[in-house]
Regions:
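Zinc-dependent deaminase catalytic domain
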Residues: 1-178
Length: 178
């Protein structure tokens, strides 16, 4: 049998840290979004293990947003509704809500034992309330969101961390060998 060369790794081996790794998973999830106005991905993690993913879009069985399933998003794209307005009329579930619902559907207790919510955007007020309710201990995001209540999140003792978007883009390019 032919002998294999053993590649020795050293301390300088370059790889994403855990936060970067799971944010890349959220970035991948957002590619499944069917929302015309904003694409968001989310991942719930506990003990460095991914519990659930979510992306924003219409509920299962409903016409995709980009196919005309959400009239609110259509009006937004036509410039008839401003960003952040009439969110109660939007049919798209948010990525964070979808990840939380997937945990419920699968019978996974998401929030206990220091679970982390990774999201490509800071969660809105409603998704923040859901994350607090299930016991998420930390929210890690890439971008801000205008409908976030930071005071509520801080009052609940959930920590917030914003990652460097350039670093995530670096890893995405590395993945694609660009």
């Amino acid at each position: 049998m032919e002998e294999l060369d053993i590649i020795r790794m050293n301390d300088s081996f370059d790889r994403p840290n855990w936060d970067e790794y799971f944010m890349l998973q959220a970035e991948l999830a957002k590619l499944r979004s069917n929302c015309m106005t904003r694409q968001v991905g989310a991942v719930i993690v506990r003990n460095h293990r991914q519990l659930a993913t979510g992306y924003n879009g219409t509920p299962p069985g409903i016409k995709n947003c980009f196919e005309g399933g959400c009239k609110r998003c259509q009006l937004r794209m036509e410039g008839k509704i401003e960003s952040g307005a009439s969110l109660d009329r939007c049919l798209c579930n948010h990525a964070e809500a979808n990840a939380i619902m997937h945990c419920a559907i699968l019978g996974i207790e998401a929030g206990s034992k220091n679970a982390i919510l990774y999201s490509t955007f800071m969660p809105c007020l409603e998704c923040s309330k859901m994350a607090i309710t299930i016991g998420i201990k930390e929210i890690i995001c890439l971008d801000t969101y205008p409908e976030t209540d930071y005071d509520l999140i801080k009052e609940s003792a959930v920590t917030i961390k914003r990652l460097d978007k350039d670093k995530i883009q670096y890893w995405a390019k590395t993945l694609l060998n660009l």
